[in-house]
Amino acid sequence: SPLVHLTLNLISLSFVSIQFDDKQYYKPKFPKKYPFSFEVPKYSELERIDNHLNLNFKKYKAKLHISYFSLENDLKRHTESSRRLAFKHTSKANSISEIIYQNDERNVYGVKFDFDGSTATSTQFFLTDSSNHFFRGALYFNTQKSDSLAIIEEYLKVDVTRIIETFCWK
């Protein structure tokens, strides 16, 4: 079936039905100024805003906010800034896990931060080639954080992982 159907019991005798799309991906055409490519889910919409991109998951009321920077001997500044932005959520997080990513063949290295708890974001990451490029993403929901979002967060984290795994520099 084209849709996966899941029913969650949120509160006794109260149910919500969520229709998840099949996981299908494609590689969008990025403007030449962006020296990277990666796969995105077909149910997302790529929005270009100045030097930033958003990957909009309208159905799930979420956006992956994306930033790209050319490095000018400032890798440390960008990695520290990304870590600071991630750990800004420490007070609300039950835990923050760091997953190191390394793909020598594609010259892509980075860290993914997964948050558990009542944080504004459920996952953030950065990717770099360590010399010329720095790419950062942060997933935010356009709604109040609640336990009912947990299943959607996990569903979209799969997409973030796919972006990281298919990411390459041009």
For each predicted feature, which ranges?
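Glycine-rich, often proline-containing surface loops adjacent to acidic residues and nearby aromatics
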Residues: 60-65, 134-138
